[in-house]
Regions:
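Active-site-proximal beta-alpha core segment in soluble small-molecule metabolic enzymes
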Residues: 2-3, 7-11, 15-18, 25-189, ...
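Active-site anion/phosphate-binding pocket segments in diverse small-molecule metabolic enzymes
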Residues: 2-12, 17, 67, 86-88, ...
């Protein structure tokens, strides 16, 4: 296959595993569940899940049933939990492939039980409690009692119960404490005891490391991919994360322009003096959005500002006369001795690292390496 375009998203599998192990070691009594939803935040779930699996990880989470089924081929004997709500008509696929599902309500469980009567085997579920996120799950104690009664069914394997902190990356613990109290109150409703109890996401995993509680699993997401959920979590200084993803390219064209010359769509940039302009083959069709205009990327060892509007397939930067065709370009991550924080790249665009990763689409090849060697 021809791979003419030099733009790549490089993924360091060693750093990924190191981050997982560091985060998992913060909570020695708990299992670290690797969140590989949304194609591992855009970095490539098949390769990442397989690498983690080969290194002993046996608990994973996806957002959809389709994602879970796709991964089962490489992590067959692992627990894979679907965090989103699936159509109850499709529970048979979860049973057939040993996939665990989120139970968001009594109605969903009742509907699922109807479909389960038509197939062999048990459905593994994790009951979702809404403790304050307001997204899915229930907080009604009477409804929880009814769910507990339905767990008597021989068609259900009550594998887990969980919730989700909505502000664990914030400065104070007030809302976390509120959610924890709601969680504990709801847990007392259940006469059936699950195998797993979990509420901590990446932020909670770091913030509440080695907390004395009854929870036995943490969900490790964005932090595994080398990003702190927030500056507040980074300031705790409990774990040193390693960058995992680097967006790189090369200069394809360099030209000199005269003072007063305009360039780009909408002629949004005008040279104040004679300048050199380098073109890089990446644009918003690749997921590098127009709001990146003005950000300073690395071209070789230089800081070069993105000038003019980001185009669909290319962008331009103002550079020195020393820049040449073929010079390395770094948008975020680590490459060729240069380093740019993805958080810095995201903050400039008024967003978060999660979105930056997820926006980089399939036209940009993912290149994986470990032991400093490309796979």
């Amino acid at each position: 296959m021809i791979n003419d375009r030099p733009t790549q998203l490089r993924v360091n599998l060693d750093a990924l595993l190191n981050n997982y192990n560091k985060l998992n070691s913060l909570n020695n009594e708990k299992i670290g569940l690797a969140v590989v939803k949304a194609d591992s935040y855009g970095l490539g779930s098949k390769v990442i899940a397989e690498h983690l699996y080969q290194n002993g990880v046996r608990h994973f989470a996806t957002a959809t049933l389709e994602e879970a089924l796709e991964l089962k081929g490489v992590i067959k004997d692992s627990m894979v939990l679907v965090l989103g709500v699936i159509n109850s008509q499709n529970v048979k696929y979860a049973v057939e492939n040993n996939v665990s599902l989120t139970c968001p309500s009594k109605e969903w469980l009742e509907e699922s039980l109807v479909h389960l009567q038509q197939i062999e085997g048990k459905l593994k579920i994790h009951v979702k409690l809404d403790t304050g996120m307001g997204r899915i799950g229930t907080s009604d104690l009477e409804e929880l009692k009814e769910i507990d009664n339905l767990l008597d069914s021989e068609k259900i394997d009550f594998e887990g119960i969980f919730s989700h902190y909505s502000n664990a990356d914030g400065e104070d613990d007030n809302y976390d404490n509120y959610q924890t109290e709601n969680f504990e109150r709801s847990l007392k409703i259940f006469t059936h005891k699950p195998k797993y109890i979990h509420i901590e996401n990446s932020a909670g995993t770091v913030k509440y490391s080695n907390r004395d509680d009854q929870y036995n699993l943490t969900r490790i997401g964005i932090a595994m991919y080398g990003c702190y959920p927030s500056g507040n979590i980074e300031k705790l200084d409990k774990v040193q994360l390693e960058p995992v993803a680097s967006l790189v390219s090369k200069v394809t064209h360099v030209k000199k322009i005269q003072a007063g010359q305009k360039l780009g769509y909408g002629v949004s940039y005008e040279a104040k003096q004679d300048e050199y302009i380098a073109t890089v083959p990446i644009g918003y069709a690749d997921g590098l959005l127009r709001r990146a205009q003005g950000f300073k990327i690395r071209v070789g060892s230089e800081e070069c500002e993105i000038v003019g509007r980001v185009c669909m397939d290319q962008l331009m930067v103002r550079c020195s006369k020393n820049v040449k065709v073929g010079d390395d370009v770094l948008f975020f991550g680590e490459y060729s001795g240069q380093k740019v924080s993805v958080d810095e790249f995201a903050e400039y665009q008024n967003t978060i690292s999660y979105e930056i990763f997820c926006c980089i689409n399939k036209r940009v090849p993912r290149v994986y390496y470990k032991n400093k060697m490309e796979l």
